[in-house]
Structures are given as structure tokens and as C-alpha cells.
Design a protein with these regions (language model features):
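Hydrophobic alpha-helical transmembrane segments
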Residues: 5-8, 12, 37, 64-72, ...
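Short, non-helical or kinked segments that cap or interrupt transmembrane helices
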Residues: 24-45, 64, 86-99
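Membrane-interfacial amphipathic/re-entrant helices at transmembrane-helix boundaries
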Residues: 1-19, 31, 45, 54-66
Length: 170
């Protein structure tokens, strides 16, 4: 049961940050249905950067590089929605849905192609050397461990809620 709770907290933090971004986008008048696709492309970019970084780089620098690459890939992919909606006056809902499908399919094809090329024709996942970088993502309280992204997500959630409550009374 504890393991289930740990993994729930680890994976929920990313989804909480994406949902919070969606709330801010909605408040500004943008219907960003493409958030899931942006998240997938960001994850793909982070994984690709981690795969091709040298093993001797060191865990802290590898984690920072991976997070920055994931953010950059996500921002570049989200630029598609901005260009389509602003420059081409495309419907945001249709474009966001198309971006989600494109991201999921594109990430699947990219990962399959990389794994097939790395394994010599077999469709087997290749290894990524983590160099103990998992320890940099975790906060330990006794035997219970959770991602520090969860702390960041909860802090962002509380701050945005407090700011929203403050605006409601003005």
C-alpha cells in the first residue's frame, strides 16, 4: 500500500503541474487542449537528451540538462498551437486535439525507431544510464520516499490558490 501511495505521489506531481498550467491558460482565455501532447513531447525530449548525454557528466548536471531539455521541447511544441490559433485563426480545440494525437503517435514512432536501431532490429527497449540520478529526484522521510516535484507542485498549487482567493475579494 505504501508503494502504491509513493508512485501515486511521484506521477501525480507532473499531472498536477500540467493541470495548473491549464488553469492559468483557461483564465487567460486560451483553451489549451494540447497540454497532454505538450507533456508527452517534453517527456520524449527529456528522455532523448538523457539517453545521449555522456555517462561521465554527473547526476546533478544530467538532471538539470534533462529538465531544461524537456521544458524546451514542450515550449517548442506548444508554439504550434500558438501559431495555429493566432496566425492562422485555427480553432483551439481542434488544433489541441490534433496536437495530442500527433504527439502521442510521434513519440511512439520515435521511441520504436530508436529502440529498433539500437537493438539491431529487435524491438527491445534500450537502456539509459542514470548514474544514480534517481536519488536527486527523491525526498526520503524514513522508509517513505516521494519526488521533490510533488513539493514544487503543492507549493505552486497553494500559491495560485492564495493568489486566486486574493483576487476574488478585490
Amino acid at each position: 500500500m505504501v508503494l502504491l501511495l509513493q508512485y501515486t505521489l511521484i506521477f501525480a506531481s507532473v499531472l498536477m503541474l500540467v493541470a495548473l498550467g491549464g488553469c492559468f491558460a483557461e483564465r487567460s482565455g486560451v483553451i489549451n487542449i494540447g497540454l497532454e501532447g505538450i507533456m508527452v513531447i517534453g517527456a520524449l525530449g527529456g528522455a532523448l537528451v538523457m539517453k545521449f548525454l555522456p555517462v561521465s557528466l554527473g547526476a546533478p548536471l544530467m538532471v538539470i540538462s534533462t529538465i531544461l531539455a524537456a521544458a524546451l521541447f514542450g515550449m517548442l511544441f506548444s508554439l504550434l498551437l500558438a501559431v495555429a490559433a493566432i496566425n492562422f485563426k485555427a480553432d483551439q480545440t481542434i488544433t489541441g486535439t490534433a496536437m495530442n494525437m500527433l504527439a502521442t503517435a510521434g513519440a511512439t514512432v520515435a521511441v520504436k525507431a530508436m529502440n529498433t536501431a539500437a537493438s539491431g532490429g529487435n524491438d527491445v527497449s534500450s537502456d539509459i544510464s542514470y548514474v544514480h540520478s534517481k536519488d536527486l529526484f527523491l525526498v526520503r522521510l524514513g522508509s517513505f520516499e516521494f519526488s521533490w516535484f510533488m513539493l514544487v507542485a503543492v507549493i505552486c498549487l497553494v500559491v495560485s490558490y492564495v493568489l486566486q482567493i486574493g483576487r476574488a475579494h478585490v
